[in-house]
Amino acid sequence: MIDLEALPHLPGCYLFKDEEGVVLYVGKAKDLKKRVSSYFQKRDHDPKTTSLVQAARGLDFIVTNTEVEALLLENTLIKKHWPRYNILLKDSKRYACIHLTGEKFPRIRIARKNTGDGEFFGPFVSAKERDYIFEVVRKTFQLRTCKKMPSRACLRYHIGACSGPCIGSISEEEYGEKVKRATSVLKGNIGELIESMEKEMKKMAAKQMFEQAMALRDEISALEYLQEKQNMERQKKHDEDILNYIVRDNTVYLMLFKVYKGTLEDKQDYVFAFGEDFLQEFLVQYYSENDPPEELIVPQVLEESLVEFLAHVKGKKVKVTVPKQGEKKELLDLALKNVEIGFFGDRKKLESLQSKLSLPKLPNVIECFDISHLSGTSTVGSMVQFRGGRPDKHNYRRFKIESVEGIDDFASIAEVVRRRYSRLLEDKHEMPDLIIIDGGKGQLSSAFQELRKLKIRVPIISIAKREEELYVPGLKSPLPIKRNEKASLFVQEIRDEAHRFAITYNRLLRQKSLIK
């Protein structure tokens, strides 16, 4: 479900997703709430945008510090996910590259197609950003733009915008050095290049080559300005993971930024129960399944044994940084900002649901059950768990129905509820704060009777598919689901996730039976 109320009035990127979680469209916004809301408020969309809105079932977003950062991040996310509606909705001209040709004296140009010799950089989502980088590189390194080498110097040479290889004012070797530097910038290695150029400038000054040193100084200044515009695409030698979290109501809300060669390419969020060594347990589990980065940026010092574990998995030392200031601290703060906005917008959903159902406490842990079958065969049950308003997929469960023959949703629901909570009682694990059944009065009654037999007192409701009504034990009339009401949208979101999970398991079992 798409909860517009959770969106902040801040810059960032938004990702529309389908019911399977596949990214349909990536966009950037100066104000996330206003931009995304406009999709659902306007009625005069073009056919392609209308199709996008109809197909969208989920929404994710990443908050950035500035609109420029959002612009750069949008480019990265589109190149990563290649969403089909971006290709349909955005002008294809915006996907042009910067091209350095393979000629003796390479020229720089904007290329619509990646054909021909030389090197291509991009594509760039933003024409504005692409043109800015193009101009900085062209002017800084005085590269030629002419299609054919003229026999005499053009105006660009006379105003200092071109080094004039056409009239022999620069050697092939010197021009080649400029092209090397331009290539380095376009690949994102600005920091390394500036460092190298500063050393060269000092050498020239020491040799009293003041004119050349001043030219290098001007180039460095232009590159430093370009670098400042790319906080979200910091180009470094190594990959980084940036991790931050908030602990609230015995629950950990954790955000992980994945930075590849300086480019923020992914955001992963996790919600799980608080434990004394939660951070160590999370890092051990996560990096047992994922390759550790060369640098891990965290808000607190890690135990030496954990640092050694990361080195063992990586095969070499992993740098662990706890920044107190500077650019890395800004990224750590940005991760925290995304935790606060991304997760605690979810708290409003929980409060709304608590109010609607008159629950004794905030429904921090919610479990929802669904039954799926195909003509009486491959009947399966699914259970999804939401913690802190987000799916906690680690605690999803599947049930192959064992005691029921044919189609009997009431008996099937009774079986999965009995099996789930008998096991929790046996293992002495925590009970959820709310149970949701996908179905009507009959399914609710079956589940409620099983809870009574087990002497479990947990609030339980059901949601009927067709009528979209909520049934509560003891109430004669169902509670209506109101359009755009936060609590109602949240219950529908949980129900839809349980249904999706059940259908997935059903398909898996059917495929296995066909193979047999």
Swiss-Prot record:
CDD domains: GIY-YIG_UvrC_Cho (cd10434). InterPro entries: GIY-YIG_endonuc, GIY-YIG_endonuc_sf, GIY-YIG_UvrC_Cho, UVR_dom, UVR_dom_sf, UvrABC_protein_C, UvrC, UvrC_RNase_H_dom. Residues 191-226 form the UVR domain. Residues 9-87 form the GIY-YIG domain. Gene3D superfamilies: GIY-YIG endonuclease, UVR domain, UvrC, RNAse H endonuclease domain. Keywords: Cytoplasm, DNA damage, DNA excision, DNA repair, Excision nuclease, SOS response. Interacts with UvrB in an incision complex. HAMAP family: UvrC (MF_00203). The UvrABC repair system catalyzes the recognition and processing of DNA lesions. UvrC both incises the 5' and 3' sides of the lesion. The N-terminal half is responsible for the 3' incision and the C-terminal half is responsible for the 5' incision. This is UvrABC system protein C.
